[in-house]
Swiss-Prot record:
Protein name per Swiss-Prot or TrEMBL: Uroporphyrinogen decarboxylase
Binding site for substrate: R21, Q22, A23, G24, R25, D71, Y148, S203, H316
Organism expressing this protein natively: Campylobacter lari (strain RM2100 / D67 / ATCC BAA-1060)
Alphabetical list of PANTHER family matching this protein: METHYLTETRAHYDROFOLATE:HOMOCYSTEINE METHYLTRANSFERASE RELATED (PTHR21091), UROPORPHYRINOGEN DECARBOXYLASE (PTHR21091:SF169)
Enzyme class label: lyase
Site location (Transition state stabilizer): D71
Claim: Lyase is one of the keywords in the record: yes
Subcellular location as annotated: Cytoplasm
Keyword rRNA processing appears in the UniProt entry: no
Subunit structure: Homodimer.
HAMAP family: URO_D
Pathway: Porphyrin-containing compound metabolism; protoporphyrin-IX biosynthesis; coproporphyrinogen-III from 5-aminolevulinate: step 4/4
CDD domains: URO-D (cd00717)
Catalytic activity: uroporphyrinogen III + 4 H(+) = coproporphyrinogen III + 4 CO2
């Protein structure tokens, strides 16, 4: 698989390319399946439909990897939290974690069993996916998932979480440790079901100052990565901590690919991390609105990464109103222009 080879810094005939959120609302085919499922969570829980939308970008765009269709918050949901996706508001937990009793009620073992719809979707997708295409499993980072569990949803300033960082770090570490335990086994089950690589999304890494990022976020991601690499050395682990361009000097650990977001200069990431890791990213997603902007972005990134291990991706998820034609153009352009 060209994608897995690139993760391990092996030479590839061209630069493999996929997009975060590639199974998403910009695709009319996705919207059809989502409408038939009823709502977002029902789509996540229907393994046949989740598999169908996972495969759509491979068939329609020709990306080199599929990423399983799911959500990072299905883990706390199946641990016993009450999750709803409110229109215009995003995810909402009606019972956020406030006390040790709240935390004790969450059941790690039950969640691993209850998440069988994700493993079933992976198994079905791997069966249907072409042999040369990789299937990526994923989870959120413990820190990013915890922000939703503690705040009760998305947040502008993460005040409740950050209050714990400084006022009651011991309790926050207990929450993160419990989540880390669940995520290790969740990812292990994804690999058993057929995932060829795994990505850990730390979407809210940038909410923390440097010292606290390494204590409350990065440390736990590495714990998951270590667990996976020890058991499955042939499975690449991708870390994607968003907005940490100022912390790159201290990024180090047992993983294979570092995801670079669009706000981080790729030259900087290459200088600091390119020798150790394959870099993934990092085109500005809004370049996809315009074909000329796509060409300029692709040329610039391929030029920077021409002598380094690289997986092409956006620096964040594709937006819902991007024309499908432009997404196709982007994928084909990367594959053509990067031919060795």
């Amino acid at each position: 698989m060209i994608f897995v080879d690139a993760c391990f810094k092996k030479s590839t005939p061209y630069t493999p390319v996929w997009m975060m959120r590639q199974a998403g609302r910009y695709l009319p085919e996705y919207m059809e399946v989502r409408a038939s499922a009823g709502d977002f969570l029902s789509l996540c829980k229907d393994y046949k439909k989740a598999s169908e939308v996972t495969l759509q970008p491979v068939d329609i765009l020709g990306v080199d990897a599929a990423i399983i269709f799911s959500d990072i918050l299905v883990v706390p949901l199946e641990m016993g939290m009450d999750l709803k996706f409110e229109k215009g508001e995003g995810p909402v937990f009606s019972n956020p974690i406030k006390t040790k009793e709240d935390l004790e009620r969450l059941d790690v073992e039950k969640s691993i069993k209850n998440l069988s719809y994700v493993y079933d979707a992976l198994a079905l997708t791997r069966e249907k996916l072409a042999h040369d295409k990789a299937l990526i499993g994923f989870c959120g980072s413990p820190w990013t998932i915890a922000t939703y569990m503690i705040e009760g949803g998305g947040s502008k300033n993460y005040a409740k979480c950050k209050k714990l960082v400084y006022q009651n770090p011991e309790f926050l570490h207990q929450i993160l440790s419990k989540l880390t335990l669940a995520l290790k086994h969740y990812i292990q089950e994804q690999i058993k079901a057929g995932a060829n690589a795994v990505q850990i999304f730390d979407s809210w890494a940038s909410a923390l100052e440097e010292e606290m990022f390494f204590e409350f976020s990065f440390k736990y991601m590495l714990e998951i990565a270590d667990f996976i690499k020890e058991k499955y050395p042939h499975i690449p682990v991708i870390l994607f901590p968003k907005g940490v361009s100022g912390f790159l000097d201290n990024i180090n650990g047992n993983f294979d690919v570092f995801g670079v977001d669009w706000s981080t200069p790729l030259e900087l990431a290459k200088e600091k991390l390119g020798a150790k890791y394959t870099l993934q990213g990092n085109m500005e997603p809004c370049r996809l609105y315009d074909k000329k902007a796509i060409e300029v972005g692709v040329d610039k990134i391929l030029n920077i990464m021409q002598d380094s291990a690289h997986i092409f991706n956006l620096g964040h998820g594709i937006l819902p109103d991007i024309p499908v034609e432009n997404a196709k153009y982007f994928i084909k352009l990367v594959q053509e222009k990067s031919k060795k």
